[in-house]
């Protein structure tokens, strides 16, 4: 990594909505340890990400990275689609 490059946060998640134009909603899951009982619990966050060209479908597993604010709710952009969802007919 060069001096000029910044560390950029990137996350993996599942697309849960693609109804907006150039925007997808990605659910990112994380595991958190319960403070009292010590059991690991799944917690999720829904993030709005910029999808130039509307290439994602619901159920796709994608990688997103943080960027400058694009709109009021979008500060993440789509990097790549890791796995396509299977089409059920």
UniProtKB/Swiss-Prot annotation:
Per UniProt, which keywords does this protein have? Ribonucleoprotein, Ribosomal protein, RNA-binding, rRNA-binding
Complex and partners: Part of the 30S ribosomal subunit.
Instruction: Provide any one GO MF term from the record.
Output: rRNA binding
Which HAMAP family does UniProt cross-reference here?
Answer: Ribosomal_uS17_B (MF_01345_B)
Family affiliation: Belongs to the universal ribosomal protein uS17 family.
Which processes are annotated in GO (biological process)?
Answer: translation
Tell me the organism: Coxiella burnetii (strain Dugway 5J108-111)
Q: Which InterPro entries match?
A: NA-bd_OB-fold, Ribosomal_uS17, Ribosomal_uS17_bact/chlr, Ribosomal_uS17_CS
Coiled coil stretches, renumbered: none
A single GO CC term, please? cytosolic small ribosomal subunit
Under PROSITE patterns, the record lists: RIBOSOMAL_S17
NCBIfam families the UniProt entry points to: PRK05610.1, uS17_bact
Q: Return the CDD domains for the record.
A: Ribosomal_uS17 (cd00364)
- The name of this protein is Small ribosomal subunit protein uS17
Q: Which Gene3D superfamilies match?
A: Nucleic acid-binding proteins
Q: Which gene encodes it?
A: rpsQ
Describe the task this protein carries out: One of the primary rRNA binding proteins, it binds specifically to the 5'-end of 16S ribosomal RNA.
